[in-house]
């Protein structure tokens, strides 16, 4: 009950990449990079376990960017042919590679990452992969020239990868789809179908993370234009409620999304963002607990997973660690209230989160 998790990324150590920066280049020589990334994963796992996080991730320590860290290993994408485009409906500009041929997966991409993390934690393990629509929105395309067709091509390679990750002991596969609250017509036209193709036959819990983005200035400024209530989810949640995805996320910390919209997701597990990633202020346990209680007016505790609003890679490491501790402690307070027992301030015992491979759990 109230199993805690994070949206995905954690800050990288300064010896691995420039801190507090998206797209930060590696600071380690190529010959030593894999070992350095794996060391960083061990730190990320330890930070989460020490904070009492129940469903842990590798913190995306082996990826420079949540999208390009996946697609850089695919055929059909030319990273030498970079162009500047507007992404997320022109919210901000980014220099991106170009699709120049058929998308294909030449070999497993993140299988070794999952095996490494799986071997070093007994907690339930989640791994994040960008969703088809968000990938399409973060690339230039000179080959398919149709966003829906390109999304289905990415869904196919995601599915190949996801099946292997689940077979390696992954408990939760999360597809990151921040584009889902930008292109609502496309969500209905082909976005949900692309998700279904991506998770077809994947034998673990599936999740979709939809959000208003990292806590970077471009996103902060954009959110100021959205009015007093953010109701974009009113169009996407009914579609997701009918989908085959198990878990859906929503930002609930310093958010203008009406929490009653969660009732459109009856039957789904909810990853509720109760940690604000757009500020360096570290929440108290009571602040987190208050946010969890507010969500519980609309979601039963058995279906609620307290979470971060989004990834925390742009934050200072000590801020992110403090927010992890607040998340774990706040959830413990509410569990105490629900059970009538004394709150356990320690990290949960490893046996509580023991994985069950190839099976729905989480």
Predicted regions: what they are:
Residues 1-362:
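Domain-level signal for soluble alpha/beta catalytic cores
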């Amino acid at each position: 009950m109230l199993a805690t998790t994070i949206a995905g990324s954690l800050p990288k150590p300064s010896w691995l990449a420039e801190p507090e920066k998206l797209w930060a280049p590696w600071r380690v020589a190529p010959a030593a990079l894999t070992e350095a990334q794996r060391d960083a994963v061990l730190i990320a796992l330890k930070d989460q376990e020490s904070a009492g996080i129940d469903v842990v991730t590798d913190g995306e320590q082996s990826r420079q960017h949540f999208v390009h860290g996946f697609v850089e290993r695919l055929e059909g994408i030319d990273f030498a042919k970079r162009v500047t485009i507007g992404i997320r409906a022109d919210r901000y500009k980014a220099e991106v590679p170009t699709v120049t041929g058929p998308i294909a997966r030449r070999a497993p991409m993140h299988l070794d990452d999952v095996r490494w993390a799986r071997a070093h934690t007994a907690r339930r393990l989640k791994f994040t992969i960008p969703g088809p629509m968000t990938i399409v929105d973060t690339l230039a395309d000179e080959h398919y020239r149709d966003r829906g067709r390109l999304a289905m091509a990415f869904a196919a390679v995601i599915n190949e990868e996801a099946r292997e990750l689940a077979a390696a002991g992954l408990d939760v596969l999360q597809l990151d789809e921040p584009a889902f609250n930008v292109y609502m017509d496309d969500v209905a036209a082909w976005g949900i179908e692309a998700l279904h193709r991506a998770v077809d036959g994947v034998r673990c819990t599936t999740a979709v993370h939809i959000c208003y983005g990292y806590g970077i200035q471009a996103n902060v400024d954009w959110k100021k234009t959205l009015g007093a209530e953010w109701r974009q989810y009113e169009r996407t949640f009914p579609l997701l409620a009918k989908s085959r995805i198990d878990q859906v996320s929503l930002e609930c910390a310093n958010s203008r999304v009406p929490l009653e919209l969660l009732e459109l997701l009856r039957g789904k597990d909810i990853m509720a963002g109760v940690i604000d990633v757009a500020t360096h202020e570290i929440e108290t346990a009571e602040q987190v607990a208050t946010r969890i209680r507010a969500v519980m007016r609309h979601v039963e505790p058995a279906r609620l997973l307290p979470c971060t609003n989004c990834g925390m890679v742009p934050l200072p490491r000590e801020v992110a660690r403090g927010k992890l501790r607040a998340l774990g402690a706040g959830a413990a307070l509410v569990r105490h209230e629900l059970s009538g027992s004394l709150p356990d301030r320690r990290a949960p015992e490893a046996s509580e989160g023991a994985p069950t491979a190839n099976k729905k759990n989480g």
